[in-house]
From Swiss-Prot:
GO process annotations (BP): CDP-diacylglycerol biosynthetic process; fatty acid metabolic process
Any one Gene Ontology cellular component term annotated for this protein: plasma membrane
Membrane-protein topology: Peripheral membrane protein
Family named by the database record: Belongs to the GPAT/DAPAT family.
Originating gene: plsB
Keyword Lipid metabolism: yes
Taxonomic placement: Bacteria, Pseudomonadati, Pseudomonadota, Gammaproteobacteria, Pseudomonadales
EC top class, as a word: transferase
Protein name, per record: Glycerol-3-phosphate acyltransferase
Organism: Pseudomonas fluorescens (strain ATCC BAA-477 / NRRL B-23932 / Pf-5)
E.C. numbers: 2.3.1.15
Catalytic activity: sn-glycerol 3-phosphate + an acyl-CoA = a 1-acyl-sn-glycero-3-phosphate + CoA
Amino acid sequence: MTRSPIRRLVFGTLRRLLYLWVRSETINQSSFTLDLDRSRPVFYVLQNPSLTDLAVVDTECTKAGLPRPVLPVSVGNLLEPAAFFYLTPEPDWLGRQDKRGAPPTLTRLVSALTQNAAEDAQIIPVSVFWGQSPDSESSPWKLLFADSWAVTGRLRRLLSIMILGRKTRVQFSAPINLRELIEHNKGHERTVRMAQRILRVHFRNLKAAVIGPDISHRRNLVKGLLNQPLVKQAILDEAEREKISPEKAKAQALRYGNEIASDYTYTAIRFLEVVLSWFWNKIYDGIKVNHLEGVQKIAQGHEVIYVPCHRSHIDYLLLSYLLFRNGLTPPHIAAGINLNMPVIGGLLRRGGAFFMRRTFKGNPLYTSVFNEYLHTLFTKGFPVEYFVEGGRSRTGRMLQPKTGMLAITLRSFLRSSRMPIVFVPVYIGYERVLEGRTYLGELRGASKKKESIFDIFKVIGALKQRFGQVAVNFGEPIKLAEFLDQEQPDWRTQELGPQYRPAWLNETTNRLGERVAQHLNEAAAINPVNLVALALLSTTRLALDDRAMARVLDLYLALLRRVPYSPHTTLPEGDGRALIQHVKDMDLLAEQSDALGKILYLDEQNAVLMTYYRNNVLHIFALPALLASFFQSSSRMSREQILRYTRALYPYLQSELFIRWPLDELDAVVDQWLEAFVEQGLLRFEKDLYQRPAPSSRHFVLLTLLSKSIAQTLQRFYMAISLLLNSGQNSISAEELEDLCTVMAQRLSILHGLNAPEFFDKSLFRHFIQTLLDQGVLRRDEAGKLSYHEALGELAEGAAKRVLPAEIRLSIRQVALHRSEDAADQLAAPAQND
């Protein structure tokens, strides 16, 4: 581009003609704008010469109010006719191209800045993507039409514009400060080469992040798995074990590979984008995305593994859609084989899903093929997504991590750590989950149903409901190498053996699962439904008058702003009354008026369903609710007393709810909450004692409601300890105690009308008992029977007096004392039927 009026006229005409058909958008304009210093000259750099790319960039700069690349720009005494250059020099009139040469504009810029130390310039790498698809070496359609790793000629670019021009995306990267490079004092030529090298690496990493790394066709990829040493050995072992020929075993391995592998196609991604755009707009009031900028930065140069929480079947569709819309490659998604249904399974496979069986036990050949497939994806740098919870959470809580996929990932990384792996937690928060009706039945005790293609019609039938908003929060990434450095500092130098199964693998994988779960909870998106559910489920009759309800919600918001749970946690907009109106509009909250005002309440169906939404945020309120519980039975406590009982109970709450604070940070966090309580009038601090308000006061009612949030969890803890103590030393196993707790919790829920199915969730008791063992409170003898410290009873009763009302403690002790006959009958029944 020169200052020639004729050339400017030709370029302007080309741009107008191009945009008769082309539609473009900028992927990350907002984050880019924040990094730009408008006081310094700006130059844009494109990777390869292309007049159409330049026209698109010029259009996007004009739309955003940024300096245009085709206008002159001055740097000191240097006047450049245009503010752009190509990293790869333009060919001469014979089509010859000297790739070793440096862009003349870059050379002149370095000279000008070297001669004038007061001047500076910003270089902004810009990429234009005509479509967004990974390469497939045997797919001429993609090679012709979609942006890939193939070199694009004029004919192919013309076809790309015709076919994919209406889906053109521009990515501006963070500016490179040329002055900073010059200050390294490397000399003119070396500075130019350094700038070129930085730009080449940048473009390569960005292209991998946006369109995906170079990957071979599915058929060749699957066949290639069979040539890997570990799979070859597994085939020979299978042939020997099953008494079949190696050829038959190899054919079986090939069938496994085809069953597993995705068939990632750009056509399917675009089809899903169109369908899902309609779907989201049809049922949701909006999708809020938070903290995506960090992912866009870290995606370049890393193998990204997205680890979302799992609340709905649409989780993976939503995440892939958002990543694609924001210029990142949709991941390959681990899906259960139960989703490989007719029609739906094929579409999911083409959208990036690869299918896995629920269990690998007893099938080493399948295990080997699956592990090798994942290793191939990881080492090629292709993004992957899987759910550490395994299945969808039916209770709204974060489920205990299933560590199988994490272990496979860790072993793959130990085998080859060339591509650094980073886990990106993704919290997906729904105001109304799509499968709510199904979960309602399961929350009431119905068994889990197998997925069917006909389930799609149930979803269509639910589209008339209001589903509110969805929030997608990207949490703090976890770099696997840094995690291993903390857990196993010498992991790089250890001899790991051919299967890459070090002795510390299981324990380290478990801790990695806990870390992922904690980071997921840190990224929680708190919404109006969560807070309304938390408030009303803490009342005796599931009802509050509207003014009291607004006060409770305002209190919760004030506390969360005063003591933020995490930098990645988000809060709803508006005050208590706005939140109430929002939930009423979604038909989740009933209202009744009388002479004194309005009563807000939950009907029977919503009362059960709202436990799901309360549980989404229970981990955030667990610690303040525990502190509030101390003042239900005690009118005053010292800081030392509060800390002592908090330290005693916190490990069990932390383990169950994946609360973020380690024990050595607990005291400081407790102090923050106590200060917030005093500021809000929930406590008074006088004469070195924290004192509760008068029982008849409004503030005491608020303190009591807050304490009820965690009451059922504390009751479960006390019940398990009471049953253990009643059984005596070395008389009951962990499994027997777990079954006994479940039976007794069901009875207690009937006696007290508890409408919370997780109260008698067997897995929660199992985890609590395991935590007692991990903490050294319990021990197993040679027969597997449990023993406990002699002071356990006194300690448990002392803590219970602080957090549970006397009538609840009495009821639990009575149930524990009279459990023998009925519990024995119920536990014996299954054994007699076997």
